[in-house]
UniProtKB/Swiss-Prot annotation:
It catalyses: peroxynitrite = nitrate. Heme-binding protein able to scavenge peroxynitrite and to protect free L-tyrosine against peroxynitrite-mediated nitration, by acting as a peroxynitrite isomerase that converts peroxynitrite to nitrate. Therefore, this protein likely plays a role in peroxynitrite sensing and in the detoxification of reactive nitrogen and oxygen species (RNS and ROS, respectively). Is able to bind nitric oxide (NO) in vitro, but may act as a sensor of peroxynitrite levels in vivo. It holds the Pfam family THAP4_heme-bd. This is Peroxynitrite isomerase. It comes from Renibacterium salmoninarum (strain ATCC 33209 / DSM 20767 / JCM 11484 / NBRC 15589 / NCIMB 2235). Homodimer.
Length: 210
């Protein structure tokens, strides 16, 4: 399946472009054994013209036939190539980026390839319950591997100390697995799912404006 790239996508997001769009499908909690609970998930990756992807994942518990039973969770965050930010980049806060992006050509992006011919990436993901994760990892073609570098927990949050996530595009479907270290346990299977693309990515020009 060809990857549709919005015409206004900033060059440094091209390695991540296969994630763009809306994805939906079924998953299983834990190891996926017979007693593991089922869930439905809707994931959206979008771009607003800046050098990161916005990420939202909504999940619902379901019965074995896929009928939604009740909301399960929501998480959201930002994904980007991992590089040192400079004067052309926006932030912190509301400091605007330059009109001309830091990386303007495919050659600029190619210089960021790592020793495995992929790209280093970072993702920040926030959960309900006072938990925020900072991931570092790599993307190589349609495969992503992420590991937490830091987990921030609020005073009342449950124990959650580390996580890994893997994503892959297989025959047009998005496969993912999430392992976590929580409640005093070491890393173990937490959830996995297979999602199908249900909506193509929008360009920044198509997104609603005030």
């Amino acid at each position: 399946m060809p990857v549709e790239i919005p015409r206004d996508l900033t060059p440094e997001l091209v390695p991540l472009s296969w994630l763009l769009g809306q994805w939906e499908g079924q998953g299983r909690l834990g190891t996926g054994e017979a007693e593991s609970e089922h869930f439905f998930q809707r994931v959206t990756f979008s771009s607003n013209g800046l050098p990161y992807l916005e990420y939202v994942a909504e999940s619902w518990l379901t019965d074995e036939e896929g009928m939604k039973l009740r909301p399960l969770s929501v998480e959201m965050g930002f994904w980007a190539l991992d590089r040192k930010l400079g004067e052309a980049d926006g932030g912190p806060g509301l400091i605007p980026a330059d009109i001309v992006p830091a990386l303007t050509t495919a050659d600029d992006v190619e210089k960021l390839r790592n020793d495995t011919s992929g790209f280093d990436i970072t993702a920040t993901i926030v959960h309900p319950g006072g938990i925020s994760e900072l991931y570092y990892g790599t993307i190589k073609g349609p495969q992503i591997e992420l590991s937490t570098d830091a987990v921030m927990r609020g005073a009342g949050a449950k124990d959650y100390s580390a996580a890994t996530r893997i994503f892959g595009l297989v025959n047009g479907d998005l496969f993912w697995r999430w392992d976590v270290a929580a409640e005093g346990n070491s890393l173990e299977a937490h959830a996995s799912a297979i999602l199908k693309k249900t909506a193509a990515p929008e360009s920044a020009e198509q997104r609603p404006s005030e």
